[in-house]
Structure formats: C-alpha cells, structure tokens
C-alpha cells in the first residue's frame, strides 16, 4: 500500500505511439491492484503516473496491461514499464519490447532472469506455460523445400508475427534502396542495350565508382595471382580454404607434369600447401536463362603459402576426373595469360555460387532462422538464455522471407542471373546440408580442422577467434549467474527442450553431425549459446560484408558462365568475354550487390542493443564488460589495419551487426 510511481516507455519508431487508452494493473506476491489512471502512449516518450494503491501487494511480480479501443485498433510499441514502490523503494523494470495489439491482457514479468529452478514457489510457472503455448501457435515450423533444414512457417511477410517485422525506418530504407538499385539497373540496361562488350574494361560501364575503395582496388588488380589467393584467406568467403593433409585423390597428373607434382609434394611436406575444393558443385544442374544454357564447374585450386604471407595459386583443375575419359587439364600460372585468367574466372564464379548459397544463405540466414524459431517456441521471456540471445535474433525472419520470395524464389534473382539458378540452387543447398557440422560453426574447432590456426595472413581467422572468445566470456558471465552447478543445467527442462528442438527438429536430426540433443554441463551451455550468437553476428558478418567489395567488379566474381569450362589452353579475349556474364546479368549482379552489401544506415553493432531485457546490477555489469572488450578489439583491429596494405574490416565489432538483419 502507498504511493507508486509508474513510468511507461514507448518506442521511437514511426507509428510506435497509439491513440488507444492503456490500462495497467500491478500484480504482487500478495495481491493485485488496478490503477485507476489510464494513459495514451506517445511515440518516443516516457509517460509517468503516480497512483495511490490501498492494497498491500508485496514484492511485484507482473505488470498487466490492456489497450482498449472503440473504433480502430491502433497498435502500440511498448519498450518497458518501471514501477517504484512506496517510500524510497527500488525501481523495478518490466521489459516488453513488442507490439501491443487488440484488447487482450498482456502480462509482463519483472525483468530478473529466472530458470524453472530459480522459481521454487512456482510464482511464474503459469505465465511461462501460457506464454509458450501462445508462442507455439504463432511460431510454427515450415518446410520451404524438402530435404532442407526447417524454417518459419509462412510464405509471405504478413504471415509473420508482428514482432518479427521490420520497424518502419528499416522497412523504408530497405525498400527505397531496392527501388534505387532497380532504377539504376534500368538506366544501365537502356544505355547498353545496343552496345557490344568486346573488352574486360567494358565492365566499367556498370561499375559503381565511389561505393568502395576496396572494390576499386579489386577492379584494378583482380588479374593478379596474389589478390586471387588473398580472397581465400580474407575475402567474401573465407571458409573454403584448408591446409592440405595429402594431395587430393581427384588431382590426376597428366604425363609431363612430374615437376608440378614434385613441387606440390615439397609444399605439402613443409606444411605450406593449401587447397580450395569446389566438388560440391559437381553434378549440380546448371541454369537456363532466356533459352540460353549456362554452365558450372567444380574446380580444385592448390595454393602455396609463402614466407611473406602471400597465398599463391599453383594449379587449377576445373572438373573432376571421369572414369574412361582422359584426365582434365591442369591450368598453371605459366600457361598463356588468357588461359590462366579464364581458369581463375571459373574458380571465382564457383566460389561465388558456394558463397551465396552455402556460406551465406544456408550457414548464415537459414541456420539463424532455426535458432529464432526454436528460441521463440521453447524459451519463455523470463528465461535468462532467452534474455541473452533475443537481441541477436532481430529482423532475421523478415529478411529471410524476403530472400525466399525475391532472391531464391521461382523467377527470382537467382533464376535470372545465377548459373546455379533454375533449381540447381535448391539441389546445392540440400547437398550442403550434410556439411552442417557442429564444429564448423565454432571457430576454434573449425579453424583447427582447416589448419588455419597460426596463419598470420589470415586476418579472418585471427579476428573470428578473438570475437568468439569475447562472446564466450559474455555468455559465461550470464550462465554463471543462473546455473551454479551442472545439475542445475541438467534439471532445466526449458533449456533441454530448446537444445533438442534446434538439433532434432530445426536441423532435422543433426546429432549425427555433432550437434547436442541435451546440455549436461555449464561449459556445454556456454559453448552452444556462443555458437548461436556468433552465427548470428560474427560469422554472418564475415560472409556478408565483403559482397560489395569483392563482387562489384563482376569479372572477379561472375554470377554465371555462358560457355562450358575450357578443355584446352587456347583461350582468347573473345573466349573470356563470351564466357563471362552479359551486360544485363552483370548489371543486375552489381545492383543487388550494392543493395545488400552496402553498409546499412539502420543497424545495431554487436553488443550495442538499446533493449534492456535483464534487471539487476549483475547482468548489467556482464554486458558492460562485454562492450568494453568489444571496444578494445575494435581498437586493436583499427591499429593493425592502419599498417596493412589491404585492411580487413569484416569482423570489427563496430561494423558487425547484432543479428542477421540484412
């Protein structure tokens, strides 16, 4: 009983306020009180109420709210509600961060994270059960294509729960940038429709100067072997390269190649031989674009790491050997320049296909979607792991629906310009699912498996390890607050259900690929949650942010190839130009690359979310330390990059987005 001071915070996004009245109730351990005053929440404002409550409520557990309307339901985005009790009592925060629609009653639990074991009296048990029951109706598993990991049910944006939709500033920026890209494409098409492309410099007609200094560097130096090799270490797709343990069985040496074999074996013995194998593309059906057959290869590249850190190609094999056929030719740096350049173009095109489908879409976007759906179905908002992970799930469902309806849909961008479009992209995604191993999502294990630990010129490896370690310590700090023993982990039914839902349902039985179906110890929880957060932040950034830099100059990353892979070494400039994308394909690649790869004006850097899901000083101290470590890493990378000829920026915490939001 006594005077209560209530503050209500409304989101700042367009339309976040509401013309509807909002009524509040306070629910304590010993009673409940309806507040006589009502409020009209205004966008970006805090509304304060002071109410005399005659009843004794005891410690506050919930704030309940109901938005009433007469003629029109006007949705309201509520950030949080705080309550200060009589006298000099502590202020208690009730996080919301969601849209309030309709006229039903919404209960907001006090912001302290609680596992089931931390609620021995069961004060929140009914709320947990009812919230998850409602969530499971909203968040249902779907199956975009048979044979793939699962996704959120619903084929259209408006099938998504309102809380998964872009806020207005994000929506406007995304749609305006898309319209701008398509308008520029139309202009370029009209200017080039009657012109013939005869020279590689003709690609300058569609190149957007000034968008990226690194893209201009790529345009000027893309033919160099050093830049070709560098991309496997620090380019848009740094997850293919591995140190060779032996010469690949597919590498068949034709007569007269004994010297090459000896050179490779020497590098192998010295531990400086690396490979990039694109065998996953073998057998994938190539696209047909406007009645014109496109083509795919499945290259193998062998590279040597020099003492100065440069990674240089030694040999390229474009196709796998076939029984009963002569071995495929091996292309060498000493071959005629156009033959060697064309072979490298084939590798870059193959890397483009695997990058966009396997590394980016499957391992970034679709994996993050599994984490989102499982989290919303299995962890109530009061659970500490939910509070920890929810900032890293923002906007993922909408951007993925947009991808499925615009990029990889029937007649989408992939079908229009990609050599894997027209169904090959789905076939490739299915086959790539076999390589979704638990260890490959965890940089300490993945980099060790690929032999990249200690490679000083692999800035991706260095930065990924550092960011992983910082995230791990952050997760460990929160986990240690709520799980004092391993038994507490084993006895948390919501945590176990969440883990099992990801592995068995979302990932379609991934326990045979190392994913856990249960968590038995605190360190296992830390590792698993760190994997989830790193996948949604650092790993996605590492394969997303480089697109504008490395793919703007189309010959460096051709979206399709219009002639078959060469079987001889008599290539000419005419052969190269006839193989690379035509002007429309190249223009569309450039436009989409700009729209998706540009730095986003509406973004939240990793760890910098404004939402406060936790109450209490201890979790806030953990978050503060996390942000300090991120800032220190960002500064270290900045200092290192200042000394580099080609800075590596993609894992700088200040540019890594907090979720898969683009």
Swiss-Prot record:
Cofactor note: Binds 1 Fe cation per subunit.
Description of what induces expression: Up-regulated by UV-irradiation.
pH curve summary: Optimum pH is 7 with (9Z,12Z)-octadecadienoate as substrate.
Residues in PLAT domain copies: 2-114
Pathway assignment: Lipid metabolism; hydroperoxy eicosatetraenoic acid biosynthesis
Tissue specificity as recorded in UniProt: Detected in monocytes and eosinophils (at protein level). Expressed in airway epithelial cells.
Key words, A-Z: Calcium, Cell membrane, Cytoplasm, Dioxygenase, Fatty acid metabolism, Iron, Lipid droplet, Lipid metabolism, Lipid-binding, Membrane, Metal-binding, Oxidoreductase
Catalytic activity of the protein: (5Z,8Z,11Z,14Z)-eicosatetraenoate + O2 = (12S)-hydroperoxy-(5Z,8Z,10E,14Z)-eicosatetraenoate; (5Z,8Z,11Z,14Z)-eicosatetraenoate + O2 = (15S)-hydroperoxy-(5Z,8Z,11Z,13E)-eicosatetraenoate; (9Z,12Z)-octadecadienoate + O2 = (13S)-hydroperoxy-(9Z,11E)-octadecadienoate; (5Z,8Z,11Z,14Z)-eicosatetraenoate + 2 O2 = (14R,15S)-dihydroperoxy-(5Z,8Z,10E,12E)-eicosatetraenoate
Function: Non-heme iron-containing dioxygenase that catalyzes the stereo-specific peroxidation of free and esterified polyunsaturated fatty acids generating a spectrum of bioactive lipid mediators. It inserts peroxyl groups at C12 or C15 of arachidonate ((5Z,8Z,11Z,14Z)-eicosatetraenoate) producing both 12-hydroperoxyeicosatetraenoate/12-HPETE and 15-hydroperoxyeicosatetraenoate/15-HPETE. It may then act on 12-HPETE to produce hepoxilins, which may show pro-inflammatory properties. Can also peroxidize linoleate ((9Z,12Z)-octadecadienoate) to 13-hydroperoxyoctadecadienoate/13-HPODE.
Family that this chain belongs to: Belongs to the lipoxygenase family.
Subunit structure: Interacts with PEBP1; in response to IL13/interleukin-13, prevents the interaction of PEBP1 with RAF1 to activate the ERK signaling cascade.
PANTHER family: LIPOXYGENASE (PTHR11771)
Protein name (database record): Polyunsaturated fatty acid lipoxygenase ALOX15
Protein species of origin: Homo sapiens (Human)
């Amino acid at each position: 009983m006594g005077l209560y001071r209530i503050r209500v915070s409304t989101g700042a996004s367009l339309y976040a306020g509401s013309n509807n009245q909002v009524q509040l109730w306070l629910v304590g351990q010993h009673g409940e009180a309806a507040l006589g005053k009502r409020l009209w929440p205004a966008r970006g404002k805090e509304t304060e109420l002071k109410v005399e409550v005659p009843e004794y409520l005891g410690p506050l557990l919930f704030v309940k709210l109901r938005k009433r309307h007469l003629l029109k339901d006007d949705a309201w985005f509520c950030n949080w509600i705080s309550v200060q009790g009589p006298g000099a009592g502590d202020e208690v925060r009730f996080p919301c961060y969601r849209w309030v629609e309709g006229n039903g009653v919404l209960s907001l639990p006090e912001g302290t994270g609680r596992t089931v074991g931390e609620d021995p009296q069961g004060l929140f048990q009914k709320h947990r059960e009812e919230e998850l029951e409602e969530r499971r109706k909203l968040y249902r598993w779907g199956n975009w294509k048979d044979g793939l990991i699962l996704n959120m049910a619903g084929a259209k944006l408006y099938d998504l729960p309102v809380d998964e939709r872009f806020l207005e500033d994000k929506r406007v920026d995304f749609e305006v940038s898309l319209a701008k890209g398509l308008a520029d494409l139309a202009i370029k098409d009209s200017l080039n429709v009657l012109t013939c492309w005869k020279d590689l410099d003709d690609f300058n007609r569609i190149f957007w100067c000034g968008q990226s200094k690194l893209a201009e560097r790529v345009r000027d130096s893309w033919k160099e072997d050093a830049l070709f090799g560098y991309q496997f270490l620090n380019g848009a797709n740094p997850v293919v390269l591995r140190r060779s343990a032996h010469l690949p069985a597919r590498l068949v040496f034709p007569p007269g190649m004994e010297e090459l074999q000896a050179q490779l074996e020497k590098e192998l013995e010295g531990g400086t031989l690396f490979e990039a194998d694109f065998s996953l593309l073998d057998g994938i059906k190539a696209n047909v674009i406007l009645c014109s057959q496109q083509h795919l290869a499945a290259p193998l590249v062998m590279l040597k790491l020099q003492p100065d850190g440069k990674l240089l190609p030694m040999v390229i094999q474009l196709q796998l050997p076939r029984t009963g056929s002569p071995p495929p030719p091996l292309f060498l740096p000493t071959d005629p320049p156009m033959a060697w350049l064309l072979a490298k173009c084939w590798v870059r095109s193959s890397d483009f296909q695997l990058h966009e489908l396997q590394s980016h879409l499957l391992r970034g976007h679709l994996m993050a979607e599994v984490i989102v759906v499982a989290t919303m179905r299995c962890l109530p908002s009061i659970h500490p792991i939910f509070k920890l992970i929810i900032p890293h799930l923002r906007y993922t469902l909408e951007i993925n629906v947009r991808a499925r309806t615009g990029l990889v849909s029937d007649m989408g961008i992939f079908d229009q310009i990609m050599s894997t479009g027209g169904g090959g992209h789905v076939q490739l995604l299915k086959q790539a699912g076999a390589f979704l191993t638990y260890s490959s999502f965890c940089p300490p294990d993945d980099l060790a498996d690929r032999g990249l630990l200690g490679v000083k010129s692999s800035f991706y490896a260095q930065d990924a390890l550092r960011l992983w370690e910082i995230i791990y310590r952050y997760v460990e700090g929160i986990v240690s607050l709520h799980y004092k023993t391993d038994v507490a982990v084993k006895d948390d039914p919501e945590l176990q259900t969440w883990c099992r839902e990801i592995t068995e349902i979302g990932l379609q039985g991934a326990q045979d690929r190392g994913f856990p179906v249960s968590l038995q110890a605190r360190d296992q929880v830390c590792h698993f949650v760190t994997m989830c957060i790193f996948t949604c932040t650092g790993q996605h950034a590492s394969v997303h942010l480089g697109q504008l830099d490395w793919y703007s100059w189309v010959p460096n990353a051709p979206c399709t190839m219009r002639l078959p892979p060469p079987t001889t070494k008599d290539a000419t400039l005419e052969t190269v130009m006839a193989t690379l994308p035509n002007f429309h394909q190249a223009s569309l690649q450039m436009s989409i690359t700009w729209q998706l790869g540009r730095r986003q004006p509406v973004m939240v850097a990793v760890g910098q979310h404004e939402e406060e899901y936790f109450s209490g000083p201890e979790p806030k101290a953990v978050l503060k330390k996390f942000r300090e470590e991120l800032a220190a890493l960002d500064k270290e990378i900045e200092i290192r990059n200042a000394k580099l000829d080609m800075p590596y920026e993609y894992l700088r915490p200040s540019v890594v987005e907090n979720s898969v939001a683009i």
